[in-house]
């Protein structure tokens, strides 16, 4: 029986992970566990906790069959702790999500959803990161169905070592989704604004605000696919090396 770990960055009680859990529980032959942060931890990146202990707590989720465990840490903490200490054995697949909001383009470098999924490849386990392109929709059914379908395919076919699939689903009625595109990481740049405020006790503080900048992305990008109404599936690899630049750097004759 294949063991599947579900995790996220929105927290164990978030609707996305519970829609995914409910869908995965329907698949015969799978053992499902959900281990996720105890609260909202979006945009945590790949932070892990080394300065205090982590407390896993079994929680009750209405209708859940799978064990559901909250962790007092980051998304990466939750996945790492689950794989190395909590689960009864090594999982066959890690799925992070379903995230509230897209993780497209350069979002992946900030995303707690993607970071939690990356703990799979870091430890030699295939993984999916799944996001819905909406901050307000409560309908995760299409994303859950596609994630379940893709999970079975990955369990059957496997993925290359060090690889995860980053999946983004447009927030459209099921019948309006045009299909699936295999894509590359696009560009998604924000015009950041730091809103300065003053605490009643005299200390200044800042809120990060801003909006998406208009960036041209070609048709093969994840950004363009979702904007056009397609589900994007992007293979992402742990190895960030620019091999084409290694010889050029050697020609600099760097010394010390």
UniProtKB/Swiss-Prot annotation:
Pfam families: SurE. Its EC number is 3.1.3.5. Transmembrane segments: none annotated. GO terms for cellular component: cytoplasm. Binds 1 divalent metal cation per subunit. The keyword Secreted does not apply. This is 5'-nucleotidase SurE. The lineage of its organism: Bacteria, Bacillati, Bacillota, Clostridia, Eubacteriales.
